[in-house]
Regions:
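N-terminal "domain-start" segment that seeds a small globular fold
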Residues: 1-22
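Surface-exposed acidic, glycine-flexible loop patches that form ligand/cofactor-binding
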Residues: 20-22, 52-53, 117-121
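Short clusters of small/polar residues that mark proteolytic maturation junctions
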Residues: 22-23, 141
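Proline/glycine-enriched tight loop/beta-turn segments at coil->beta junctions
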Residues: 23-29
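Conserved hydrophobic packing residues within short motifs/helices of P-loop NTPase cores
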Residues: 29-31, 62, 128
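Amphipathic alpha-helical repeat scaffolds
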Residues: 33-37
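Structural microenvironment flanking redox-active thiols in thiol-disulfide oxidoreductases
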Residues: 40-105
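Thiol-/selenol-based redox modules, centered on thioredoxin-like
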Residues: 107-110, 114-159
């Protein structure tokens, strides 16, 4: 049996809560590897804006902090959570730190890469837009700002 993205379970960024991604079945998802000390970190603002705009229509952003690229994330989850909340007002779900390369790579991101044919997570803030059926609709690199995804998100929400 092949795993789907809904078969994955991850610990939330703070606290002991573990969340199964089945909770997000039938939603349009934007899955992003994030970092608090990166030149692309201001994208948190755009990600939160998308989440606020579309969450009532069945859209969710899922953030996965990572220090895989130049250690650009805090080592303590609480610092990451505070940074995101204080500086960018982040309310979308954030999960515990994940590896984005090597043998310990987050299995969800391995699956997302496989679906898109991309070879690797190239840097922080790689984005995967996932349809309600759980398939990757499109991959966006770090340089693509969240605001540029609005028409694709609306298209998927209207399906």
């Amino acid at each position: 049996m092949n795993l789907t993205l809904y078969d994955h379970t991850f610990p939330k960024l703070t606290g002991e809560q573990v969340e199964n991604l089945a909770k997000y079945r039938d939603q349009v998802l934007l899955i992003v590897n994030t970092a608090s000390k990166c030149g692309f970190t201001p994208q948190y603002e755009g990600l939160e804006s998308l989440y606020e705009k579309y969450k009532e229509r069945g859209f969710t952003v899922l953030g996965f902090p990572s220090d895989s690229f130049l250690k650009q994330e805090f080592s303590e989850s609480e610092k990451t959570a505070e940074f995101c909340k204080v500086n960018y007002g982040v309310t979308f779900p954030l999960f515990k730190m994940s590896k984005m390369k090597g043998r310990e790579m987050n299995p969800l991101f391995q699956e997302l890469l496989q679906q898109t044919g991309e070879k690797k997570i190239s840097w922080n803030f790689n984005k995967f837009l996932v349809s309600r059926s759980g398939h990757v609709y499109r991959y966006y690199g770090s340089k693509i700002k969240p605001e540029a995804l609005k028409s694709d998100i609306e298209s998927l929400l209207n399906e």
